[in-house]
Amino acid sequence: YAGGIQRVTIAKANKLALKNEVWIIVTDNKDKPVFPLSTKVHLVNCDINYFEDDWKSRFYILKGIIYKRKQHKKRLKEILNQIQPDIVISTGTSEKNFLPYLSVSSHPVFIREIHSNKNYRSLHAQSVFDKLLAILGDFIDYRIHLKKYDRTVVLTKEDKVVHWGKNTEVDVCVIPNPIISFGSKKASLINKKVIAVGRLAFPKNFSSLISAWKYVIERHADWTLEIWGEGELRTELEEQIRNNQLTNNIFLKGYTYDIFSPLYEASIFTLTSLFEGLPLVIIEAMSCGVPVVSYACPCGPQDIIADGHDGFLVPVNNEKVLADRICRLIEDKELRKEMG
């Protein structure tokens, strides 16, 4: 699955490669990149394949991580000493906790990018055991390893002020994600269709959106909801849709490489995430003239949307208010145009 981090990283690499020598080092990508990669960018695969253990038990995942992490450190160190880079950037994936400790003869500047809310582990945790793991993970990551980096980059002012303002051990700056593309035209806003986009996974909170849609169809049974994306919760969400007798109203459309085609056909865009980094899809929806109704989750939506002016912000998991804001836009075409 190619998500926002991959998309943004490739876009930045393409731009930097115009005047610099740029390398992207990956661990799992056996195929060509999903998004266009400049021929000036060098792509190297460590061939670690963390993802092949994703669906196994925790024992096998832990066993695999220990063995593969050792391989990863060895191969990454070899590659970096061959490249002799001036700057090395971690996007916050599997290398983040060992990268600044590697012995690289060019003595590069190490930069850590954080593409999600600082508290994503605790926000993601559901069981008591997972919450304890989240506390431990945050301590190891932020209190031990992160201060070894020369600079840390977060995506929003909200994240820096709320989560990093009192931390004097870490040098934090704000660099928002680039706006990679805008819609080439405006949506007509005449179709009776609301769309949402994202991985079918716990953080995207589509179960809450499905629950809210029950209230929407009480007032507007002729409107439909399309959810674009794939993920591990597809079966569970399909069951929720069936159990709530919404199979004629909600459609899971799968993954698309072209997000603008669905946006052009939409009249409203909605985001119900529990947490975000900086959701580019909100900006892309706005660029197509599609009004946005979003949960005011940390972090990102509140940096982009002025509530009641160019969209609506709703308290997280307040499904009745979410449905009400969607219905207000359904019932007022002029408001849709104004907010879009």
Q: Where on the chain are the PLM-derived regions?
A:
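N-terminal strand-loop element at the rim of the active site
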Residues: Y1-A2, K15, K19-K63, V174
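A conserved mid-protein helix/loop that constitutes part of the nucleotide-sugar donor-binding site
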Residues: G3-A11, K192, A196-Y215, E232-E238, ...
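Membrane-proximal helix-turn-helix segments that form the acceptor-binding/catalytic region
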Residues: K74-E78, K118, K131-T152
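Donor nucleotide-sugar binding/catalytic pocket of nucleotide-sugar-dependent glycosyltransferases
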Residues: Y142-G183
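Nucleotide-activated donor-binding/catalytic signature segment of Leloir-type glycosyltransferases, i.e.
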Residues: E238-G254
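Aromatic "clamp/platform" in nucleotide-sugar-dependent glycosyltransferases that forms part
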Residues: Y255, L274
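Short hydrophobic beta-strand element within catalytic cores of glycosyltransferases
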Residues: P291-Y295
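Conserved acidic donor-binding segment of nucleotide-sugar-dependent glycosyltransferases
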Residues: A306-G308, F312-E319, C327-E334
